Amino acid sequence: MQESRDIGSPRTASVGIRLLVLLATLLGLAVAPVHATARGAAAPFKVLALYNGTWDAAHINFVHEANEWFPQQAAQNGFTYTASDNWNLLADGGVDEYKVVLFLDDLPQTSAQRAGFERYMRGGGAWMGFHVAAFTTEAQSWPWYHNEFLGTGNFKSNTWGPTTATLKVEDRTHPSTKALPATFTSSVSEWYSWSNDLRQNPDIKILASVDPSSFPLGTDPNQTWYSGYYPILWTNSEYKMLYANFGHNAMDYDTNTPLSSTFASETQNRFLLDGLKWLGGAGGTQSPAAPTSASARTAMSQK
């Protein structure tokens, strides 16, 4: 009988309560880091890639590559990837839900698309463009994009055929290039030059250019660069943007067979991923607000 009374005694109950409290505390310590990690995990940012995909086999092949490569990188790098050939998403506000917009092989063609893109960028959107996204021989038809945003003006020349280039990293403090070596070998591409000297534009920060050790650059003597200064990667400090000169694979045009891959350079891929993370908000800064141009306001009012 005495044993039965001891089990229910205040002293025994007190010990039991203390044990329960200790157990609860230990369980709380074990679970807390999991909840803290879950609360601290950033939601993936959304990326929209716009493409044309209908002209020049090399550009089409790049689009196919990009639409395979970026989704493969998405989960481990904190973003989601959607590809579309509907450029009217720029005109009707369909891009507003995306943190970053990519132009893979073209640029907006209608006034509504152009006005929508300008509004998106001035409103804090982010952009990465490749190769032909800067191509034009009529910069005056969209001066905000070609002269202010990109700073390039008109297309001036290109190399041919597509080759690798040794690139000199000019700014190793920018989030997109801080992990890159002083020089690196690019993937194969055709390379463009433009009428405007980007070095003279105070808003343009050139991140990488053709290293002189690359010359001569090209395989056709009539379309080879033998000397000069050629920007390859840059940003505009007035916007959250990055432009990359590459995006044109070597091709066997007789059989439409690719002879190279834009994503063959691991160092170049590092730029793409670090740049995309910066654009998506990892360590970046807010885009400066800027007034919309008169042409954009007119186009938007006509929607």
What are these model-predicted stretches?
Residues 1-15:
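N-terminal secretory signal peptides that target proteins for export/translocation
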Residues 18-30:
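Bacterial N-terminal signal peptides
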Residues 33-39:
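Sec/Tat signal peptide C-region and signal peptidase I cleavage site
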Residues 41-45, 50, 61, 69-72, ...:
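Extracellular ligand-binding/catalytic regions of CAZymes and related secreted enzymes
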Residues 46-137:
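Helical hinge/lid and interdomain linker segments adjacent to catalytic or ligand-binding clefts
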Residues 54-55, 89, 108, 134-135, ...:
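Short, solvent-exposed loop/turn segments at secondary-structure junctions
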Residues 66, 103, 107-183:
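A glycine-rich, often tryptophan-bearing local segment used as a flexible ligand/cofactor-contacting loop or short
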Residues 158-243:
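Catalytic beta-strand/loop cores that center a nucleophilic Ser/Cys/Thr
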